[in-house]
UniProtKB/Swiss-Prot annotation:
The keyword Cytoplasm applies. InterPro entries: SmpB (IPR023620), SsrA-bd_prot (IPR000037), SsrA-bd_prot_CS (IPR020081). GO terms for cellular component: cytosol. It holds the Pfam family SmpB. This is SsrA-binding protein. The keyword RNA-binding applies. The lineage of its organism: Bacteria, Bacillati, Bacillota, Bacilli, Bacillales. Belongs to the SmpB family. Required for rescue of stalled ribosomes mediated by trans-translation. Binds to transfer-messenger RNA (tmRNA), required for stable association of tmRNA with ribosomes. tmRNA and SmpB together mimic tRNA shape, replacing the anticodon stem-loop with SmpB. tmRNA is encoded by the ssrA gene; the 2 termini fold to resemble tRNA(Ala) and it encodes a 'tag peptide', a short internal open reading frame. During trans-translation Ala-aminoacylated tmRNA acts like a tRNA, entering the A-site of stalled ribosomes, displacing the stalled mRNA. PANTHER family: SSRA-BINDING PROTEIN, TMRNA-BINDING COMPONENT OF TRANS-TRANSLATION TAGGING COMPLEX. The gene is smpB. HAMAP family: SmpB.
């Protein structure tokens, strides 16, 4: 992913818990008028979202963008499938990798960059239950060490 990511609107924390993220890609989003307004307001949920390659195009499914509150009867469908904009080489690479067993395309975060909504898309491999427990133990150990240093600094 490029160095300068813009303002992060939404993150998929569950993806980092359930998957090993091997590569990340920056993809543009094809949106309707009221969708970008809802994204700017931060009313988007990536929790159950996933991406698929279909006919040489990448589509994101189950990404929930709430309807725009000031919108009229032409408001968008919150759960519609949305197209992602990637280079052809990236799409071919993702299509080949996603066909392998255990790999998935997972949306990681949505952010604004130069006025455009972008999505960080991760090529991910699923974690087993023991991997999740191991990561949780490591996280707790780091937290205990940080707490011990903080308490020592106070004395």
């Amino acid at each position: 992913m490029p160095k300068g990511t813009g303002k992060v609107i939404a993150q998929n924390k569950k993806a980092f818990h359930d998957y090993f993220i091997e590569e990340t890609y920056e993809a543009g989003l094809v949106l309707q008028g009221t969708e970008i307004k809802s994204i700017r307001a931060g009313r988007v949920n990536l929790k159950d979202a996933f991406a698929r390659v279909h006919n040489g195009e990448v589509w994101v499914h189950n990404m929930h963008i709430n309807t725009y509150e000031q919108g009229n009867r032409f408001n968008h469908d919150p759960l519609r499938t949305r197209k992602l904009l990637l280079h052809k080489k990236e799409i071919d690479k993702l299509a080949g990798a996603a066909k392998e067993t255990g790999y998935a395309l997972v949306p990681l975060r949505i952010y604004l960059k130069n006025g455009f909504a972008k999505m960080a898309l991760g090529l991910a491999k699923g974690k087993k239950q023991y991997d999740k427990r191991h990561d949780l133990k490591e996280k707790e150990a780091k937290r205990e060490i940080a707490r011990a240093f903080r308490d020592r600094q106070k004395m």
